[in-house]
Every structure is written in structure tokens, then in C-alpha cells.
Design a protein with these regions (language model features):
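Conserved short alpha-helix immediately C-terminal to the canonical SAM/SAH-binding motif I
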Residues: 187-191, 229, 256
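Hydrophobic beta-strand segment of the Class I
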Residues: 221-223
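N-terminal auxiliary segments of SAM/dcSAM-dependent transferases
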Residues: 8-118
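Core SAM-dependent methyltransferase catalytic element
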Residues: 270-289
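Conserved SAM/SAH cofactor-binding pocket of Class I
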Residues: 130-214
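Conserved beta-strand elements of the Class I
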Residues: 124-125, 158
């Protein structure tokens, strides 16, 4: 008889608006899910159906119940559970990731989707891995648009908190002479290196397990992380820039944008500007000295 297939639980959590970032983080960190995807309204993860599932779900529900009390969500996010077979789950999350045109010329496509390249297209092929889901959050798109606006042939770029490596790859394909990508997560480092190789830019992009590049200064620093992390890392981000260099910071919910911008202004960043998509904001500033 054929072996019985492993069953998986598809856990979908409401994650709209201001709560999206924290709900996604709770789903990943509380459950350790082995597949992850997001849409504008939902965060979805996949867990094996085993003796640990019940306790894992109880822990997730408890963490979500704390969000309104902490002022992080208006109500307790709803959870929907669906069971899928082994043959289905590994590819189920991929349905959310389709080719997207971003800015004027950038196209981000998953490795499993075809794309007919048009004149002027800069095509970024990404396999984000299940740990990084679809990889095209609004903050990623904001950073990609900013890179398209500011990367010129020959510039140097640092990508702090690189994740899947998408921003580092984009900078290289847009003409950067050198890109230094860093992440404190060893899994991110591995996946980013794979995506760098996939796009043929290993000669211009290096990926290291670190919070910021340990040496050198850069014309552009992009940091798509979190508002509080950006504030904590401001001295290091400032030091990583050449005088007159530009910081592109995102991962910022709109309710925190003024706070982050004021902090950067007080830290000798000038010419501050913001861009936004939905509830998410990118803040740019220039090192003034």
C-alpha cells in the first residue's frame, strides 16, 4: 500500500491595514510555519497536522487576542483553518505571486512564471522561498521605485535586511557597480545568495550575515525593515553612507512616518521626503555631513 500522505493545515489570519505587519510577524514567529504568503488582507501559513498543532494554534490565538489590549489591532483577527494534502501544500502559497510591473521599467517575476520581455524591461527573477512568501509587500514596491529613481551606473548600494535579496538584485540590474547586502538571518542570507546567482549578478553583489556592511561607505543605503529598527540603527545607517549619500527607509506604517522622519532629521539627515502605498510609507533622506 502507498504511504499515507502528510496532511497540512493552512492557517489564514485577517491582516488588513495597520495590523498587517504585526499579524504576519506573529504568524511566522509563533507557529514557525513552513510556508508563508500575504495578500492585502490576509497572512497565510502552513503547518503539519501532528500532535503539536493544537498547542501551536492555541499559542497563536492567545498572541492575537493580546493585540487589541496592546493597541495594535482594533479587534482580535479572525483565523480560518483549511486542511490540505502533502501534494498540494508546497505549491499552494505560490498562487499569490504573479509577475508585477513596478515603476517605469522594473518587472518582478517568480521563477515558475513566464514573462515576455519588452523593450526597456528590467526583469528580476525571484524564488523567495517559503520562508519569505510572495516577497512583494507594499514596502518592497516603494523601495524598488526609489531604487529605480536613484540608482545610476557606477553607484554603490547597501541593502540592510535584505531578506530574499530582491532589492540588492534590483540595484545591480539597474546599474550599481557594487551592492553589499546584509541580514542577521542565516536563512535569508542563503536565499538571497541563491537569488543573486539566479539573476547573474554575483560579480556585483555580495551577501553577508550581519546587521550592516562591516566596511565601506555607500552612495545609497536601502533599509526595508521596521520603524523602531530604523530608529535604533540610524547611527549605523548614517555611518554607512558617504556624505551626500541617500537613505531609503521603509517598513514604516503611516502612523509612524512622522516619528521616523523627525528622528532622521534630528540625526543630520536632510532633504527628507516620503512616498506611500496604502498604509505604508518610505522615507528618504540625505546624509548632510
Amino acid at each position: 500500500m502507498p504511504a499515507e500522505q502528510q496532511r497540512w493545515a493552512e492557517i489564514a489570519v485577517d491582516a488588513a491595514g495597520d495590523a498587517q505587519e504585526i499579524v504576519g510577524a506573529l504568524l511566522l514567529n509563533t507557529t514557525g510555519c513552513q510556508g508563508y504568503a500575504t495578500t492585502a488582507t490576509t497572512a497565510t501559513g502552513y503547518l503539519p497536522v501532528d500532535e503539536r498543532l493544537e498547542n501551536t494554534l492555541l499559542a497563536l490565538k492567545s498572541a492575537l487576542a493580546d493585540l487589541p489590549r496592546a493597541g495594535l489591532a482594533p479587534t482580535v483577527p479572525d483565523i480560518t483553518i483549511r486542511f490540505v494534502a502533502e501534494a498540494d501544500w508546497a505549491n499552494a502559497w505560490k498562487q499569490y505571486f504573479k509577475p508585477q510591473t513596478i515603476g517605469r521599467h522594473l518587472v518582478v517575476k517568480p521563477t515558475w512564471e513566464a514573462w515576455q520581455k519588452r523593450p526597456g524591461d528590467v526583469v528580476i527573477a525571484i524564488d523567495p522561498g517559503m520562508a519569505f512568501g510572495t516577497g512583494l509587500h507594499a514596502t518592497t514596491r516603494l523601495c524598488l521605485q526609489a531604487l529605480e529613481n536613484h540608482v545610476r551606473p557606477g553607484v554603490t548600494v547597501a541593502d540592510v535586511g535584505t531578506g530574499s535579496g530582491i532589492l540588492a538584485v534590483a540595484a545591480a540590474l539597474l546599474g550599481a557597480a557594487h551592492v553589499s547586502a546584509t541580514d542577521v538571518d542565516p536563512l535569508a542570507v542563503r536565499i538571497a545568495r541563491e537569488n543573486v546567482a539566479l539573476n547573474g549578478v554575483t560579480d556585483r553583489v555580495d551577501v553577508a550575515e550581519a546587521s550592516v556592511p562591516p566596511t565601506g561607505t555607500f552612495d545609497l543605503v536601502v533599509a526595508n525593515i521596521l520603524a523602531d529598527v530604523i530608529k535604533d540603527m540610524t547611527p549605523a545607517l548614517f555611518a554607512a553612507l558617504t556624505p551626500g549619500g541617500r537613505l531609503i527607509a521603509s517598513g514604516i506604517i503611516d502612523t509612524r512616518a512622522i516619528d521616523v522622519a523627525d528622528h532622521l532629521a534630528a540625526s543630520d539627515f536632510a532633504d527628507l521626503t516620503t512616498s506611500r502605498e496604502g498604509e505604508w510609507v518610505a522615507v528618504e533622506g540625505v546624509r548632510s555631513r
